[in-house]
Amino acid sequence: MAVSVRIPTILRTYTGGESEVSASGTTLAEVLDDLDASHPGIKGRILDDNGGLRRFVNVYVGNDDVRFLDDLATPTPDGTQISVIPAVAGG
């Protein structure tokens, strides 16, 4: 199933500057695997060493934060838009 993944500026070095890329998968985990196959290294910036979402990275499937759904097992229906949003901190 094809989905659209919106890539934040800080991760666009992995996508050749593309702000939106296509990926396939029926769950978020599968989409991230497919995304990493096409854009090596990007998954390591989204997931931590234990394979969970990094603490300061939010991922939305449609308008819903996956942390309040099924996390990496969240379904990703065909045509869904996924947004990767890193937290911004400053002082």
Residue ranges and their predicted role:
Residues 1-90:
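Ubiquitin-like/PB1-type beta-grasp interaction modules and other compact soluble beta-rich domains
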